[in-house]
Amino acid sequence: MALKKKEFNKKLKHFTINFGPQHPAAHGVLRLILELNGEVVQRADPHIGLLHRGTEKLIEAKTYFQALPYFDRLDYVSMMCQEHTYALSVENLLQVSIPRRAQFIRVLFAEITRILNHLLAVGCHAMDVGAMTPFLWAFEEREKLMEFYERVSGARMHASYFRPGGVSQDISVGLVDDIFAFVAQFGQRLDEIEEMLTDNRIWQERLVDIGVVSAQEAIDWGFSGVMLRGSGIRWDLRKNEPYEIYSDLNFQGVVGKTGDCYDRYLARVEEMRQSLSIIYQCLNKMPRGSVKIDDAKISPPSRSEVKQSMESLIHHFKLYTEGVFVPAGETYTATEAPKGEFGVYLVSKGSSRPYRCKIKAPGFSHLQGLNFMACSHMLADVVTIIGTQDIVFGEVDR
């Protein structure tokens, strides 16, 4: 007598695991609840807020000058680009225009910061996938750029160099020469990183057709920066809505085709090359002149003036105790930060402290899209997708 086979109608439950918040590839304090069917991701649920510090509320209790250092500590990889947005928003409320030399210096260091960010993004992305060498090469170059930060502001990371009304101090001739020397050799270092990664079969297998974002999806989810341009949309605030001196500079917009992780990697590498071109133009075209606005109620007098003039001493004291009184109004200012569109919505009631400061961080929008980007991919691909999003939790959690 043949035994009848039993029919099983049981439904297998999906496996749920925690990714992070203490994971080397989480890029900070990301906690992901991953729902897996075998090794295939069915759902990725990001849990944020582990680095929340209440920055927007803290800014309301500070003067406009005292609020500036908070912006260094949001995206702590692209510090001066965040200062840039805040300084521009305060200047918009004050309705002042800064000297042309100060604008050149700002753009120069904004592009140095872009290279700093992209080197870390590409280097860490490579290390997450399994390539250690590009990470070490990237940090070797970042060290040189951080030295430029230190020489101009005294700090390697949290510079507080851009100020409402200009920059804190002028750059020296020796520093300009050293930046020239860096620009001359950095292209070759980029070639070495590309030689290691771009045509590497393993690198391509891990990135091509992974985390594909169509142009419409990128718009619907509010993506910006490389995440938007990688999907084929030409949107760069430096080109489309130029600020400072970007309209006077010649550089190419970088656009991808397929919207996958590999395209976004190529876009970041090419953006570093375009930043080199912008830095070179800034150094060659930079005019002489002041680096601060000539208004003692906005920009503090120099140390030498404070020691010689009682009026300058009074201005200095009043500026740093009471702060600058900004006319009532509101403004939204956005710049093309390395990770995307970084925006500051600033409201003034006519006092020396902001009434409201709302910060728009690009990483927040990008992290929202992680679920649809990771769905139906393997567990190992989640690390690749997080790396290509270039998430930093200082700006996401704020």
Curated annotation (Swiss-Prot):
It catalyses: a ubiquinone + NADH + 5 H(+)(in) = a ubiquinol + NAD(+) + 4 H(+)(out). It is found in: Mitochondrion. Keywords: Electron transport, Mitochondrion, NAD, Oxidoreductase, Respiratory chain, Translocase, Transport, Ubiquinone. SUPFAM superfamilies: HydB/Nqo4-like. It is an enzyme of class 7 (translocase). PROSITE patterns: COMPLEX1_49K. It comes from the Eukaryota. One of its GO terms (cellular component) is mitochondrion. GO terms for biological process: mitochondrial electron transport, NADH to ubiquinone. GO terms for molecular function: NAD binding; NADH dehydrogenase (ubiquinone) activity; quinone binding. InterPro entries: NADH_Q_OxRdtase_suD, NADH_UbQ_OxRdtase_49kDa_CS, NDH1_su_D/H, NiFe-Hase_large. Its EC number is 7.1.1.2. Belongs to the complex I 49 kDa subunit family. HAMAP family: NDH1_NuoD. Core subunit of the mitochondrial membrane respiratory chain NADH dehydrogenase (Complex I) that is believed to belong to the minimal assembly required for catalysis. Complex I functions in the transfer of electrons from NADH to the respiratory chain. The immediate electron acceptor for the enzyme is believed to be ubiquinone. Component of the iron-sulfur (IP) fragment of the enzyme. Component of the iron-sulfur (IP) fragment of the enzyme. This is NADH-ubiquinone oxidoreductase 49 kDa subunit.
